Amino acid sequence: MSLLKLCKGDLLTRVLATGTFDLLHPGHLHYLSEARKLGNELYVIVARESMIKHKPKPVIPENQRVTMVNSLDVVDKAVLGSETNIYEPIKNIKPDVITIGYDQKFSSDSIEKNLEELGINAKVVRINKLSDCSLCSSGKIIDRILERYC
């Protein structure tokens, strides 16, 4: 907690967002902006390539993805996730709120249960999809590129 916040008497609410963030697009910006509104400090865990099992491997290498996410004004700090345990970096960050995207396969209830077992008291919030966005997925961007150039 910053000294400025302590002096002002403001409560710091640390929000944690997670994701792959391959081929950054408006959907990612919506997700992170909405997550930021839930608190006054936004941390982001960028998934390691070795931990992504539910979809194709990212096009952009993990070090470049975390650098891009770190460069966004809405983000206070982005870090790479663990290569063995998804909850490891969460213990270090100590969030008050954890956000998950509309398309993430995790159940809010199961995450909260796992967090509770680890002694982490954080609320889990699912962020809604950005409406009216035809290219709000890395897969759709890749499909469009293939359509136009192959």
From Swiss-Prot:
InterPro entries: Archaeal_FAD_synthase, Cyt_trans-like, FAD_synth_RibL, Rossmann-like_a/b/a_fold. It is an enzyme of class 2 (transferase). One of its GO terms (biological process) is FMN metabolic process. The keyword Nucleotide-binding applies. ATP binds at residues 20-21, 25-28, 103. CDD domains: cytidylyltransferase (cd02170). Coiled coil: none annotated. Its cofactor is a divalent metal cation. Pathway: Cofactor biosynthesis; FAD biosynthesis; FAD from FMN: step 1/1. The keyword Nucleotide-binding applies. One of its GO terms (molecular function) is ATP binding. It comes from the Archaea. It catalyses: FMN + ATP + H(+) = FAD + diphosphate. Keywords: ATP-binding, FAD, Flavoprotein, FMN, Nucleotide-binding, Nucleotidyltransferase, Transferase. It holds the Pfam family CTP_transf_like. Its EC number is 2.7.7.2. Catalyzes the transfer of the AMP portion of ATP to flavin mononucleotide (FMN) to produce flavin adenine dinucleotide (FAD) coenzyme. Homodimer. Belongs to the archaeal FAD synthase family. NCBIfam families: cyt_tran_rel (TIGR00125). This is FAD synthase. It comes from Methanohalobium evestigatum (strain ATCC BAA-1072 / DSM 3721 / NBRC 107634 / OCM 161 / Z-7303).
